[in-house]
C-alpha cells in the first residue's frame, strides 16, 4: 500500500519487495489465519485483482470462494459479502470449502468412497482434511503454516551458525529442503 491508499503491488510482485520496501510503502496482509483481517485492503485488492484479470473489461462471472472448513459462518459470510459488495458483476457467488476445492484442483476423485487425505500448508495456517464420497469426513485448521516454519529456520540458522537471515531467505531455504515434488518423494499410507 503506497501512501496509505494506493495498492502499489500485490502477489509475487509485492513479495519481491518484502523486507526492501521504502517507508512510504506499507506491506499489508489482508488475510490472517484464513479469515479477513483487513476488510478495506481486501476490498481494494479484490477490485485490483479482478480488474487486472479482466483487463479492465469486467463482465458478469460466477465467483467461487474457497474458505477454510473450520471458520465460523460469520467469517464465511464475510467472504461472500466481500464479493457481493465489491460491485464486480457477479452472476453467482458460491462459498466452497477449501478442502474440496484443493482436492478438485489436484485432480483427485473426491467422490471416491476411499478416503483421501489432503494437507494444505498455507502462510499462517495448515488445513488437514479427509475427503470421501464428495464430502469432508474430517477437517482441522491448525494455526501453523509456512510463516512459523520460516521462523523455525531463522532460529535454527541463528543458533547453529550465529547468522541472522530474513524471512524471505528462510522461506527459500524451507522451500528448497522441503519440496517433495522435485525429487519425486511421496508416501502412501494405509491404515
Residues covered by each model-derived region:
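Nucleotide/phosphate-binding catalytic cleft detector across ATP-hydrolyzing
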Residues: 1-123, 130-191
